[in-house]
Amino acid sequence: MTAVGTDGLDAIRTDPSRAVLGFDFDGTLAPIVDDPAAARAHPGAAPALARLAPRVGTLAIITGRPARVAVEYGGFEGVDGLVVLGQYGLERWESGALTEPDPPPGIAEARAKLPGVLEAAGAPPGTFVEDKTHAIVVHTRRCAEPQVALDRLRSIIEALAERTGLAVEPGRYVLELRPPGVDKGRALRSLADAFAAKHGAPPSAVLFAGDDLGDLAAFDAVDALRAEGVPGVTVCSASNEVTELAERADLVVDGPAGIVELLGTLAAADSAPE
């Protein structure tokens, strides 16, 4: 645990009712699986979130998935007080209500062109596409050599993104096409700013937990808030596939099981993580 991370956890423990806590879904609250549609939250995640939600100022899941999908796969429908920001913050689910914009035109164009692009490039067997409505994802996890396949496809996906006005976000054997200027850092910052606007003061602390490259933007947001005087904590749900987050994080835990343990500790009034 880093010194600044310890300060952040102490601030959460001292004044949890003004803390803003954000968690990624896949790889953080839910184990990574070969089929995205088969992903489900760790069985302890929803109960732990339900215990924590009444104690903190804002409790949110920030995910690249559609918000309703994360709610369904996580079993979060009955977690009072939980906010789910889907599609990197484009969608907001709260108390059963979903707010979402129309998909940008570039997504429809990319959706139409991507099958032909992959075929022309000779995409390796096992390559598949996930349609998130506001984003399109190319997966290589099922390929015989996932990283080789990902590297082979990277340049053609980047070229398609440029033609359609989209951005490419790499991840754990994925390349995601999504609108530019949308990321988990902006989503986390929006939660902190909304809290400050509502309460007339910044949060007592901010925490974000993630596992993949797309979560680094949220780590950057925590760092920016620290620079403004808000204690912060960055948490890595560790895997053997991505090391960058562990190198940046204040606290590294053992995958979704470790995240659930952290949630339970945060929910306990008389203790904080070591």
Where do the model's predicted regions map?
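Active-site phosphate-binding/coordination module
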Residues: 40-132
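Structural recognition of alpha->loop->beta junctions
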Residues: 76-91, 159, 245-261
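The start of beta-strands in P-loop NTPase/AAA+ ATPase cores
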Residues: 19-21, 82, 206
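Conserved acidic, metal-coordinating active-site core of Asp-based
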Residues: 121-209, 213-221, 228-230
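Conserved Rossmann-like nucleotide-cofactor binding loop
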Residues: 28, 67, 214
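Non-catalytic pre-domain segments flanking phosphatase-related domains
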Residues: 1-25, 29-33, 44, 51, ...
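Mg2+-dependent phosphoryl-transfer enzymes with acidic/Ser/Thr/Gly-rich catalytic loops
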Residues: 2-3, 16, 42, 185-274
